[in-house]
Amino acid sequence: MQQPSSTTPLSQTHNRYPDSLYLELATTPVLSGGTDIEQIDLYLRIDFHEQWQPINAGRVKFGFKGGELKIHLENGKMPTECHQLSGWVQLATDKTTQSSPIECQVLSQGEAESPVWTWQGKTGMSVLQGSLPQTKLGTVQVMGQPWGIEAVFTVSPGDVYLTSVEGLWSHTISPNQLAVLERKLVLFLLESKLQPYLSRVVWHSDQHPGQQKSEPPNTEDQTVEIDTGETEEYPELADVIQRVITAETDNFLELAKIAGLNPLVDFSGAKLLGINLSGVDLSGANLRGVYLRGADLSDMDLSGADLQRATLGGADLSGAYLSDADLSHADFHRASLALANLSSANLSSANLSSANLSSANLSDANLTNANLSQADLHRASLMLANFNGATWLNSRVEEARFSKNSGLSEEWKLDLKQRGAIFEG
């Protein structure tokens, strides 16, 4: 294997919005025998916070629910077994706030030449807040000369979250108007401010002889902060806001059309608190990570929709059509799903505690590791459903129908029968 000669790695760091996301990537070369670099240990430090951005006559505060750290390697590789950072981590908060550390899940994946770390907060959490002190990310195996490491942190529409809006509209607008306008602002911020990346760090080999120990990135000189003191004018955005506010309709689909939004793809991760979507057809929509607490979703068509990690606590989904929908890791605590059709839906690891599922159709649904504690399942159809690892504590199952289910031991079957469940076949 061709190895570089005596080298000193050089770095460049660019944090575009350091008040909201600040990233450092440090390297420690591991020498082989003499002066050749055989491996490079990577160490990550990352800070998440909220940031104000002036827009027209007002301003918005935003943060991030997650994002992706992508690394591209030149003449190097980092196979999965060389990844160190993975699983749940704690983000330390400012001591002056006296708040508890925030938990964040980090998933590592990708090819050996282009590994990826996906960051995501807990379901229902607003934004990531706090700092991860310098932590070993993994080890790069150097394959030749010249070598290079490029790391970029990017966010998608589902990762950007508004925590406050001031001076752009009245607080008396409807929940539907608010949901559409906030989503328009998120996409505007993403397209005009947050792309192509939030942070970028580049390390590369130096062809000249020098010391072997690398220096940490010079972030002071290369970090660029946005100027949040001056108001920026965006007349087209102001026009959209005005047209949504003055619209003679509160229909969600019509408001989305006025704002130039596609309801099937533009609301992933959106905050849709308390909106009215009763009877609306959003079959096949990408609503992953959406926040729908307290929303009226009765009689909706959400068949085949992606609602992974969605927050639907207290929402009314009575009579909704959710067949084949991906509802894994979704939160339905105290939601009403009475008479809903959830046939063949993926409810793995979903929180259905205290939910009303009376007379719902859950046939052939995947309820692996689902929480059904204190759920109302009386008269529900549960035939062919998979209950591996499901929790049934104090759930109501009178006249609920079971047949050919996976994951139900004889002990559980007896317990459910004693509570009034009906087993057929």
Indicate residue ranges for each PLM-predicted region.
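Intrinsic-disorder-associated interaction segments
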Residues: H14, G33-I37, S170-A179, R183, ...
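Tandem repeat scaffolds
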Residues: T228-G425
